[in-house]
Amino acid sequence: MTIAIGKAEEERGVFDIIDDWLRRDRFVFIGWSGLLLFPCAYLALGGWLTGTTFVTSWYTHGLASSYLEGCNFLTAAVSTPSNAVGHSLLFLWGLEAQGNFTRWCQLGGLWPFVALHGSFALIGFMLRQFEIAQSVRLRPYNAIAFSGPISVFVSVFLIYPLGQSGWFFAPSFGVAAIFRFILFFQGFHNWTLNPFHMMGVAGVLGAALLCAIHGATVENTLFEDGDGANTFRAFNPTQQEETYSMVTANRFWSQIFGVAFSNKRWLHFFMLFVPVTGLWMSALGVVGLALNLRAYDFVSQEIRAAEDPEFETFYTKNILLNEGIRAWMVAQDQPHEKIVFPEEVLPRGNAL
């Protein structure tokens, strides 16, 4: 007679069963974050492809914006709703469209659809990095780094128009449409002179410089561990030792600049810190623009330039250029406002 001693198997709940299935090791990991990521990414991308292929912007902007109307990849866009809609979420079943899909597209309903699902998809992707990092016992710095692009997307596409009078003032989802929005930001907010924009540019370009320097330095200090004829065949992918010399790299940059990173942790943290902080700062600046905050208005130079025709600076020339952008864009974008600029604020003929 055999007697088995042990604990009885506990009853597994529905949550445990779902958790096991979601976090199972498979070719494409799903996880709990995937419940947010995959549906939202699918709907956002599908909405954008549908809009750029078929949907006109005639009713919202008076523009052609789809492949069907003759646009190409650079000029097609999913455009924002008209200014009359305000901040309505434009649900398909809402008061505006009343379940009519064609009318919903004409009103610009695809834009909030793509913007909101796109935002949640990006957040889902960040949570995916958190979830997988936890599973394989990694620190969560990848997810923290990805918060930079998310903060920029949310601030530009959601927070900025929420601070203005409607979704109309957000960027449309298209290449040329984004360029037009950049000109709008410059003309109405003098964005290039904003210190938060400067920090964002420093972060992005500084990160590109660091990336190029780091990649070149590692390539320059690789050990010759194998007999391969080129760099990429000279190493065993399973080797345990380092593939490049930090000491040699440190000596090189110490001679070049007089200072160099002393260890890899500080080096790679700095490469993380520069771009992410730059993106965070630029997102913060856009939140300020949503509230119509100004930065670096050198009024004394403007007054002197107005009084003395021979006095001009690059700043005063840019201010006049911004006024020209506003004078053109208001008539183009907001004809319903019937805004008339007084003569004294229009660009002078010889000023540009």
Curated annotation (Swiss-Prot):
The protein's UniProt keywords, in alphabetical order, are: Chlorophyll, Chloroplast, Chromophore, Electron transport, Iron, Magnesium, Membrane, Metal-binding, Oxidoreductase, Photosynthesis, Photosystem II, Plastid, Thylakoid, Transmembrane, Transmembrane helix, Transport
- Ranges in coiled-coil conformation: none
Which reaction equation describes what this protein catalyses?
A: 2 a plastoquinone + 4 hnu + 2 H2O = 2 a plastoquinol + O2
Q: Where in the cell is it found?
A: Plastid, Chloroplast thylakoid membrane
InterPro entries (alphabetical): D1/D2, Photo_II_D1/D2_sf, Photo_RC_L/M, Photo_RC_L/M_CS, PSII_PsbD/D2
Residues recorded as binding pheophytin a, renumbered to this chain, are: 129, 142
Which EC number applies?
A: 1.10.3.9
**GO biological process terms held by the UniProt record:** photosynthetic electron transport in photosystem II
Query: What stretches pass through the bilayer?
Result: 40-60, 124-140, 152-165, 207-227, 278-294
Q: For this protein, what does the record note about how its cofactor is bound?
A: The D1/D2 heterodimer binds P680, chlorophylls that are the primary electron donor of PSII, and subsequent electron acceptors. It shares a non-heme iron and each subunit binds pheophytin, quinone, additional chlorophylls, carotenoids and lipids. There is also a Cl(-1) ion associated with D1 and D2, which is required for oxygen evolution. The PSII complex binds additional chlorophylls, carotenoids and specific lipids.
Residues that bind chlorophyll a PD2:
197
Q: Which residues bind Fe cation?
A: 214, 268
Instruction: Report membrane topology.
Output: Multi-pass membrane protein
Which one Pfam family would you cite for this protein?
Photo_RC
Amino acids binding a plastoquinone: 214, 261
Residues bound to chlorophyll a ChlzD2 are 117
**UniProt keyword Electron transport, yes or no:** yes
What EC class does the entry list? oxidoreductase
Q: What else is known?
A: 2 of the reaction center chlorophylls (ChlD1 and ChlD2) are entirely coordinated by water.
Protein family:
Belongs to the reaction center PufL/M/PsbA/D family.
Summarize the protein's role.
Answer: Photosystem II (PSII) is a light-driven water:plastoquinone oxidoreductase that uses light energy to abstract electrons from H(2)O, generating O(2) and a proton gradient subsequently used for ATP formation. It consists of a core antenna complex that captures photons, and an electron transfer chain that converts photonic excitation into a charge separation. The D1/D2 (PsbA/PsbD) reaction center heterodimer binds P680, the primary electron donor of PSII as well as several subsequent electron acceptors. D2 is needed for assembly of a stable PSII complex.
Matching PANTHER family, A to Z? PHOTOSYSTEM II D2 PROTEIN, PHOTOSYSTEM II PROTEIN D1
Assembly, in brief, is: PSII is composed of 1 copy each of membrane proteins PsbA, PsbB, PsbC, PsbD, PsbE, PsbF, PsbH, PsbI, PsbJ, PsbK, PsbL, PsbM, PsbT, PsbY, PsbZ, Psb30/Ycf12, at least 3 peripheral proteins of the oxygen-evolving complex and a large number of cofactors. It forms dimeric complexes.
Protein name as it appears in the record = Photosystem II D2 protein
Species whose genome carries this gene: Bigelowiella natans (Pedinomonas minutissima)
**Protein's gene:** psbD
